[in-house]
Amino acid sequence: MADSNALEGLTQALRKLPGVGVKSAARMAFHLLQHDKPGALQIARALEHAVNSVRHCTLCNTLTEQEVCATCANPQRDRSKLCVVETPADQAALERTLAYRGLYFVLMGKLSPLDGIGPNDIGLQKLFDRVVPRDEHGEPLPPASREVQEVILATNFTAEGEATAHVIAQALKSRGVQVTRLARGVPVGSELEYVDLGTIAHALVDRR
């Protein structure tokens, strides 16, 4: 690495991106500083703007610049269906299929006891309160009076994703909620954002 604290700092910052190792980070840093300084400044400005402007939707947790995201605010969406995903990237993958017109809840993660990630870290209580709201006396509304009639579990088909889906399903079924899971057309061990759109669409249609 060249004798530059600034260059080293940029390289270390780029390494924070998923899948970027030492060599890739150094290559990107050299390219930006040697060949594309205007592009580097554009990236810096865009990143700063996004960090300062983007927040979590108060209803579904996805990333948005508004208090409520465009999907949750859209009156044309089917509010009786709620699809639970791990990340905004998974939500985007489902949206691209054009096969789903309901609403979403983004966990922003998955259960992983080995990493110290438990139910409170991924907002499970917020999900349960969304699906099974309570009346003015603090009692759960009966199934027929709830807005959400079906919860579709679209967590990834990894060990952690399956465990997360199982915990959510058990909790919601005990509250009288209809819970379905994406069909097994999605390969085991895969993440939704990397699965082709046709496969995701079929998994949605064939959910059970």
Curated annotation (Swiss-Prot):
PROSITE patterns found in the cross-reference section: TOPRIM (PS50880)
Domain Toprim: 80-187
Transmembrane segments annotated in the record for this chain: none
Keyword Nucleotide-binding annotated: no
Zinc finger (C4-type): 57-72
Alphabetized Gene3D superfamilies for the sequence: 3.40.1360.10, 6.10.250.240, RecR Domain 1
Organism superkingdom: Bacteria
The family this protein is said to belong to: Belongs to the RecR family.
Role summary: May play a role in DNA repair. It seems to be involved in an RecBC-independent recombinational process of DNA repair. It may act with RecF and RecO.
Record protein name field: Recombination protein RecR
Gene giving rise to this polypeptide: recR
